């Protein structure tokens, strides 16, 4: 699953979310 916009942390999802590349930055 992709991170929601505004939830990016250095281009990655927060620990409580699935790790991966965030879309939209």
From Swiss-Prot:
Subcellular location: Secreted
Keywords: Antibiotic, Antimicrobial, Secreted
The keyword Secreted is assigned to this record: yes
Source organism, top-level taxon: Eukaryota
Record's GO cellular component terms: extracellular region
Protein's GO biological process: defense response to bacterium
Signal peptide: none
Stated role: Bactericidal activity; inhibits Staphylococcus aureus.
Full protein name: Antimicrobial peptide THP3
């Amino acid at each position: 699953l992709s991170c929601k916009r505004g939830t990016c942390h250095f281009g990655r999802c927060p620990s409580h979310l699935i790790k991966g590349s965030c879309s939209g930055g």
